Amino acid sequence: LVGDTFTHLTNGNKGYSVHGKESKYIKWVKDHPLAEGTFYIDNTINDGIGDGRKGLKYLWLLESKHIKPGMVESIIDNKQLVEDTYETIFTHDQRLLALGDKYKWVPAQGFWIKEPKIYEKTKMISMIASNKRMCEGHVKRLGWVERIGDQLDLYGRGFNEIADKEEGLCDYMFSVAIENGEYETYFTEKLLDCFATGTIPVYLGAPDIGDHFNKDGIIDLTEEFEVSEEIYYSKMDAIKENLEKAKEMEVLEDFIYRRYFQ
């Protein structure tokens, strides 16, 4: 694995793409002569082109275009060189997926919840946010905090800090989930963590989210969104379906292995 996107493990090897999770099928190492292939993450595109490593090379784009601007454009501008270097390019970006068979879809993130299930609900609605302002999505999220923060239980860095996301989701029927960007096929743990706790997301993000999950189990975030205990339990079939769909995306390494290597 080339790139510092993932957390380092205490044994000196790399961690995994999803916070607190390990893959069932893939083990990342820094350097190993028997490695079956090398993955290059995000901005390490040029490392793979010029480092002389043997064996198959794969490029994996995890971050959104709002956090890592210019990555997709760089690949499009150097399409032939990238395709000659990499066996497969894994991405959630539709501009790349439209370029051909070398480009394979992977969710932008898995989920962080340790035990995915439908938890007993005792509270109405929460929101997990932070005070970061690195991109448009951060600013938009803070705008919604200002508008509706007094109507829900607010958690996150700079607000009511919590050790684990379960604290802000498990007890709640609904939770506001706002992605860092609003474009097709881009969704992250902000959405999947809701599904993994049986919580209905009040969502602002991928406009095509209904192509991936049961839209009846998602409420669009608007100025007039409505939540109630009656609404929650009327959507239980969709809640169960979205939980099962989310489980398939829990750890991205496992998603990649099952879909593209098995």
Regions found by a protein language model. Give the residues of each.
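Pol beta-like nucleotidyltransferase catalytic core
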Residues: 1-61, 65-155, 160-177, 181-262
